[in-house]
């Protein structure tokens, strides 16, 4: 999965009495969850988190290292934090390249890899003494510190990945699949819902593989046995009564069993499946599962069972050796699959990826041309599919209310990566509200609507 790059210098909302730690979180939602866990532990120990380098006694930078632009952003951010503060701890995916970080930034206080929560806290203790605080007064909310808006949250169900995609280095950074106990996942989900969360976004490196590493062993939740398996997890999450959105789903056969849950309204009819390509030879070079014919058959079957199903995917153009004919096969796949939401990236030779050694690399000029052609085809598909939504009514979750009106999302839209629903400012609403909207206009990405009575 291509990581979404974003930076957040955060303020946990803590009191202003304790020792202050600055924090910068870079990268994808999985990294954001790591940041939330570190921040929660800091707050539990009485540290304050500040959004100013100047006020902090040290700064933690949680890095991304998936693609070259992410590496550069991480290195630049470390440099900025050093220049502004002077005391910096580095963690996250880029932390596995400790020598590279120290060579460029020798003054960092310490470097750790991803999900190294205890090591990060130990390094903080080494440089900033634990503040005196009363844990019964300075309470951390049961759901922990969250960096997302209060009405939605990411629910990470596992770490690592057992795949060895040739364009990816995630397993070398985050290790093999390590599924969280299903009871722990469901407990976190309940705490989040109890705190007011209206949407849970299930994330991992490979959501479909949840529980494979522990042979789908039985755990317990609320006194009842539950298998560590994607299907059983979805069935239990559905009982929370909030939107459940699935991300990073590989098209394994058992995904077919999730579609009826969507058709029954138990979880959102939304699947994020990173197909990456359609040509059989390219998929084999990528070490990716699937073939276009089989995928198209399954998509048709899914839509027959659940007509409202929305499918998001990501693709790579310009993979080493990709011919014009193979790229055109990808375009034909787009036309046949009629996917709802699509992202596309030019192949990036990530340091350490085995695909870099493949012959016949595609020039950047050709990659850019293919990217533009790909996006033009998908823009037309997306526009046509959204035009069909005009006149229909949807429940939306309000994300923002500003001077121009209300900004929300329907079940078709995940935060940050998909489209939005815009309404005029004639309605009384606040973030986290759920309201019914009739769509009156659409382009290739977003829709506009008017409120209707519940």
From Swiss-Prot:
Residues 19-129 form the MTTase N-terminal domain. GO terms for cellular component: cytosol. It is an enzyme of class 2 (transferase). [4Fe-4S] cluster 2 binds at residues 161, 165, 168. SMART domains: Elp3. PANTHER family: RIBOSOMAL PROTEIN S12 METHYLTHIOTRANSFERASE RIMO (PTHR43837), RIBOSOMAL PROTEIN US12 METHYLTHIOTRANSFERASE RIMO (PTHR43837:SF1). HAMAP family: MTTase_RimO. Its main location: cytoplasm. It catalyses: L-aspartate(89)-[ribosomal protein uS12]-hydrogen + (sulfur carrier)-SH + AH2 + 2 S-adenosyl-L-methionine = 3-methylsulfanyl-L-aspartate(89)-[ribosomal protein uS12]-hydrogen + (sulfur carrier)-H + 5'-deoxyadenosine + L-methionine + A + S-adenosyl-L-homocysteine + 2 H(+). This is Ribosomal protein uS12 methylthiotransferase RimO. Belongs to the methylthiotransferase family. RimO subfamily. One of its GO terms (biological process) is tRNA modification. It comes from Colwellia psychrerythraea (strain 34H / ATCC BAA-681). Binds 2 [4Fe-4S] clusters. One cluster is coordinated with 3 cysteines and an exchangeable S-adenosyl-L-methionine. InterPro entries: Elp3/MiaA/NifB-like_rSAM, Methylthiotransferase, Methylthiotransferase_CS, Methylthiotransferase_N, Methylthiotransferase_N_sf, NA-bd_OB-fold, Ribosomal_uS12_MeSTrfase_RimO, rSAM. It comes from the Bacteria. It is found in: Cytoplasm. Residues 387-453 form the TRAM domain. The gene is rimO. Residues 147-384 form the Radical SAM core domain. Its EC number is 2.8.4.4. Its cofactor is [4Fe-4S] cluster.
């Amino acid at each position: 999965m291509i990581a979404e790059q974003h930076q957040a210098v955060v303020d946990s909302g803590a009191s202003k009495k304790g020792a202050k730690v600055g924090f910068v979180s870079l990268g994808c939602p999985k990294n954001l969850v790591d940041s939330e866990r570190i921040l929660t532990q800091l707050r539990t120990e009485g540290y304050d988190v500040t959004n100013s380098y100047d006020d902090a006694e040290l700064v933690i930078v949680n890095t991304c290292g998936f693609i070259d632009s992410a590496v550069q952003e991480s290195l630049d951010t470390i440099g900025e934090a050093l220049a502004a503060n002077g005391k910096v701890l580095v963690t996250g995916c880029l932390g596995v390249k400790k020598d590279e970080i120290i060579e460029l930034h020798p003054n960092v206080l310490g470097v750790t890899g991803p999900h190294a929560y205890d090591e990060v806290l130990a390094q903080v203790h080494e440089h900033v003494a634990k503040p005196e605080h009363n844990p019964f007064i300075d309470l951390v909310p049961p759901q922990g510190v969250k960096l997302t808006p209060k009405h939605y949250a990411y629910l990470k169900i596992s770490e690592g990945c057992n795949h060895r995609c040739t364009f990816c280095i995630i397993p070398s950074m985050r290790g093999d699949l390590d599924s969280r106990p299903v009871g722990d996942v469901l407990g976190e989900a309940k705490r989040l819902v109890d705190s007011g969360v209206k949407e849970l976004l299930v994330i991992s490196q490979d959501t479909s593989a949840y529980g494979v590493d522990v042979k789908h062993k039985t755990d317990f939740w609320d006194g009842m046995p539950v298998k560590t398996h994607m299907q059983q997890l979805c069935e239990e999450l559905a009982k929370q009564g909030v939107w459940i959105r699935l991300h990073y789903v590989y098209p394994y056969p058992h995904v077919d069993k999730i579609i009826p849950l969507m058709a029954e309204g138990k979880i959102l009819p939304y699947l994020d499946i990173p197909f990456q390509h359609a040509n059989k030879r390219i998929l084999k070079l990528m070490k990716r599962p699937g073939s276009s014919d089989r995928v198209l058959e399954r998509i048709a079957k899914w839509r027959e069972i659940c007509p409202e199903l929305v499918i998001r995917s990501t693709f790579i153009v310009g993979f080493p050796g990709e011919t014009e004919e193979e790229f055109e096969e990808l375009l034909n796949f787009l036309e046949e699959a009629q996917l709802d939401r699509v992202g596309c990236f030019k192949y990036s030779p990530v340091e350490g990826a085995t695909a870099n050694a493949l012959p016949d690399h595609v020039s950047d000029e050709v990659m850019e041309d293919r990217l533009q052609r790909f996006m033009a085809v998908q823009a037309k598909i997306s526009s046509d599919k959204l035009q069909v939504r005009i006149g229909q009514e949807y429940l939306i979750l309000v994300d923002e209310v500003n001077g121009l009106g209300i900004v929300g999302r329907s079940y078709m839209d995940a935060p940050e990566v998909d489209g939005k629903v815009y309404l005029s400012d004639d309605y009384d609403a606040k973030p986290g509200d759920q309201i019914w909207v009739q769509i009156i206009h659409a382009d290739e990405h977003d829709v506009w609507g008017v409120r209707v009575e519940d």
